[in-house]
Curated annotation (Swiss-Prot):
It comes from Homo sapiens (Human). This is Eppin. Changing residue 127 to A: Does not affect the binding of SEMG1 or LTF. Does not affect the binding of SEMG1. PROSITE patterns: BPTI_KUNITZ_1, BPTI_KUNITZ_2, WAP. The keyword Signal applies. The keyword Disulfide bond applies. Residues 102-133 are annotated as: Interaction with SEMG1. Residues 117-133 are annotated as: Interaction with LTF. CDD domains: Kunitz_eppin (cd22611). InterPro entries: Elafin-like_sf, Kunitz_BPTI, Kunitz_BPTI_sf, Prtase_inh_Kunz-CS, Serpin_venom_toxin, WAP_dom. Gene3D superfamilies: Elafin-like (4.10.75.10), Pancreatic trypsin inhibitor Kunitz domain (4.10.410.10). Might be used as a target for male contraception.
Length: 133
């Protein structure tokens, strides 16, 4: 197959990606887990150990002091504050995009979302230097 054959194949993949949606492009160009250094006061319980344990094509990534299912198309720093339905009392931090700062909140200990950090330093390290439109 010459260079024109490869070019035709590439054009076909691009067209299929536009028609089929993100599934094909994710297969061709998989997204990677974020690499963020964090200092953890304690190791959190892992939600997953492998990608197949995550729903909705999320990836199992080391994030915020434990393994969690992340939607790599969604920025955790843009998620709202969620305390979760449980009644524990953990002082955690979340990133408020509107104010461009990390604020303390009471996390109930379960569920919620991934905009949830053990320390202000971890929150700032993950979210502060991002450029938002």
């Amino acid at each position: 197959m010459g260079s024109s054959g490869l070019l035709s194949l590439l054009v076909l993949f691009v067209l299929l990606a536009n028609v089929q949606g993100p599934g094909l492009t994710d297969w061709l160009f998989p997204r990677r887990c974020p690499k963020i250094r964090e200092e953890c006061e304690f190791q959190e319980r892992d939600v997953c150990t492998k990608d197949r344990q995550c729903q909705d094509n999320k990836k199992c990534c080391v994030f915020s002091c434990g393994k969690k299912c992340l939607d790599l198309k969604q920025d955790v720093c843009e998620m709202p504050k969620e305390t979760g339905p449980c009644l524990a009392y953990f002082l955690h931090w979340w990133y408020d995009k509107k104010d461009n700062t990390c604020s303390m909140f009471v996390y109930g200990g379960c569920q919620g979302n991934n905009n949830n950090f053990q320390s202000k330093a971890n929150c700032l390290n993950t979210c502060k230097n991002k450029r938002f439109p």
